[in-house]
A protein has these predicted regions:
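Active-site ligand-binding patch in enzyme domains
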Residues: 140, 144-146, 150-286
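Residue-level signal for inorganic ion chemistry
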Residues: 12, 30, 76, 116, ...
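Short, small/polar residue-rich loop motifs at catalytic or cofactor-binding pockets
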Residues: 25-28, 148-149
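Short, basic/aromatic recognition patches
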Residues: 2-24
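Zn2+-dependent cytidine deaminase-like catalytic core
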Residues: 33-130, 246
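Short beta-strand scaffold segments in enzyme catalytic cores
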Residues: 28-37, 153-154
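Short helix-loop-beta connector
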Residues: 63-67, 184, 287
Length: 293
């Protein structure tokens, strides 16, 4: 019987999509366990990145000896805050492991196959035709130590971004797409000028995604952010960072009392300064940034 490996890998990717942008610096991975042509278990990388998907898929199965594991990314081989995923794969006596991408993390890169070979487990890298760019953000994270950055820009037909006669230059469909987009990023980068003007919550207001509130970074070098804003209601449950000049250090106490976290920078004049800011955001624990301003 011919096995459609891409079918099961695509199932794994559909699982991984669910937590995209919700796993901090770890990639969102999906795993599917197949035995005798039947999916007997599945797993996704947990929120905030741990446990990993392979562990979630295999931990509670009593009898998966001889089964095949399909996972979107090469199983990790190193000890970190959790044991390597190859351990539980070996322990559960998985027969075959198929994965769509090699992990660019130097601690794991191309090492899983060597371990599986030693244990008599067949493993194979199978590229997915439908998800060939899925880990683009993760590869950028690992290569440059910066977050993956996407800019959302709303522009009218006459190439304007503001309409003084209407609050919106977009329609309901495009606004819903923005809410979906926000759900796939762990933080949003905006400016005090934009937030003061719109008083936007910058959250996900769409059925099924209401609980997803990406953390927020606000560039405000001159500390012009208004003290009374709608987003202030969520400062206790949503991390909000105020990025300002070191020269304004002594003027941040009121914002701290409200619940803002302060990030001090020297300047923000060119792309080099912006890249330094991105590195700072990445070190804070964010891998995917959506710019809205």
């Amino acid at each position: 019987m011919t096995i459609n490996h891409n079918y099961y890998l695509d199932l794994a990717f559909k699982l991984a999509e669910k937590n995209l942008g919700q796993t901090k610096l770890n990639p969102s991975v999906g795993s599917v366990v197949v035995k005798n042509g039947t999916v007997i278990s599945s797993g996704i990388t947990s929120l905030n990145g741990r446990p990993h998907s392979e562990f979630n898929a295999l931990n509670n199965i009593k009898n998966c000896s001889g089964a095949s594991l399909y996972t979107t990314l090469e199983p990790c081989t190193h000890y970190g805050k959790t044991p390597p995923c190859v351990n539980i794969i070996i322990k559960k006596k998985i027969k075959n492991v198929y994965y769509a991408f090699e992990d660019p993390d130097f601690r794991t890169f191309k090492k899983a196959k060597k371990i599986f070979d030693q244990k008599g487990i067949k493993s194979k890298l199978i590229r997915s035709k439908n998800y060939n760019n899925f880990y683009k953000s993760y590869f950028i994270n690992k290569k440059k130590s910066v977050p993956f950055v996407t800019a959302k820009i709303a522009v009218s037909k006459d190439y304007l971004t503001i309409n003084k006669k209407s609050k919106w230059i977009t329609n309901k469909t495009s606004r819903n797409i923005v809410h979906l987009l926000r759900s796939r990023y762990d933080c949003i980068l905006s400016t005090s000028k934009s937030i003061n003007q719109d008083d936007s919550l910058l959250n996900c207001r769409i059925d099924g995604l209401n609980n997803k509130k990406p953390d927020l970074f606000i560039i405000d070098l001159k500390l012009k952010l208004r003290k009374k804003l709608l987003l202030n209601k969520y400062l206790k449950i949503r991390k909000t960072y105020l990025i300002t000049s070191k020269k304004k250090h002594n003027q941040t106490s009121e914002y701290k009392k409200l619940g803002y976290k302060i990030i001090l920078i020297d300047k923000l004049h060119d792309k080099n300064d912006l890249n330094l800011l991105y590195k700072k955001i990445y070190k804070t624990g964010y891998s995917r940034v959506l710019i809205e301003t």
